[in-house]
Amino acid sequence: MNLPGLTGDRVLPPALRGPFNAESRRWLEALEVAGHDPIHNLRPCRVKPVACGRLAIVQESRRTGVGIPILGYLLQTPDELIVVDCGLSPRWRGGGQIHLGPDDSPSPGTPYMPELDGPSLAEQVAEMGLKPDRVICTHLHEDHSSGAVELGLPVEASGAEWARLDESDAESRGYPVDELAEVPRRTIELDPSAPLGPFLASARINTDVIAVDTAGHTPGSISLVASLGSAWVLICGDAVYPRMDDPDGPAWRGMLRISRALADLPALRVLPAHDTTVLRAVDGDAWMGAAAMPVDSDHD
């Protein structure tokens, strides 16, 4: 696959660059799963990470009343409908706030997520009458993977993420051990002999989608590069959000390397998982709550 602009050490900022065009709308829709009144909020990163550094995640007052979205994406290609990140399990509905980060060393910058308030991603997909073919998780933190049980499909993630899930402290690090014990595993095998532009390893998902190595936020984080007609997108999960418990370690350096690369690729639109600019840039208030744009009928 020839990806325009994916050469050398260049790429784009970790927030959506420009609005979706009509052709992109045919293929991609975002679902906001939750995001009401968290204790902490992520501030959308609208500048190059090399400039904003550790301010990619900041602590804000609860009094702001600004919710943080937890975004899952439905990626429709000619071959299949893929759920990319599946949000929170219904067990978080009315269950209080969750802490994503190590229980033994919470930091001021560690984000707190709200309880699930409203329909889960799977419930929204069912209401739209859609039947996904695959579920791919950029990483296995609970706000990206715990909703998988409802979808009734195997979960695909990198080998490094599955290995992290099996470690003794996985649950305290934000991995939904109990929920993921109920779903079949599929491993995406990243090939270091197949780098793609600034990404050190890749794996083909189908003719229109490639998984790339964006380890840093977690040891096995991946992102998906997708061809959407004339547009290219990178669904990056939390790859551009640093781990605050390891600010100077390899995780931070990996995140910073990817973010620097993403700062200069003008041909690529970057879709993070917790950035309100994605919602505003796509369709304003129409994207809030359970509202979602239907998949184009030509590609059902």
Question: Where do the model's predicted regions map?
Answer:
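Active-site metal-binding motif and surrounding structural segment of the metallo-beta-lactamase
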Residues: Q97-E156
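Zn-dependent metallo-beta-lactamase
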Residues: M1-P111, P294-D300
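Histidine-centered catalytic micro-motifs
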Residues: V135-S145, D213-S221, L271-T276
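Core dinuclear metal-dependent hydrolase active-site scaffold
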Residues: P49-C52, Q59-G65, L71-Q76, I82, ...
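Metallo-beta-lactamase
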Residues: A30, A34-P38, M113-L130, G159-D213, ...
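Active-site metal-binding loops of divalent metal-dependent hydrolases
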Residues: C52, C86-S89, L140, A160, ...
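Short, low-complexity, polybasic intrinsically disordered segments
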Residues: S145-E161, D166-S168, G284-D300
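Cap/insert and terminal regions of metallo-dependent hydrolase folds
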Residues: R10-A15, P106-A122, G229-D300
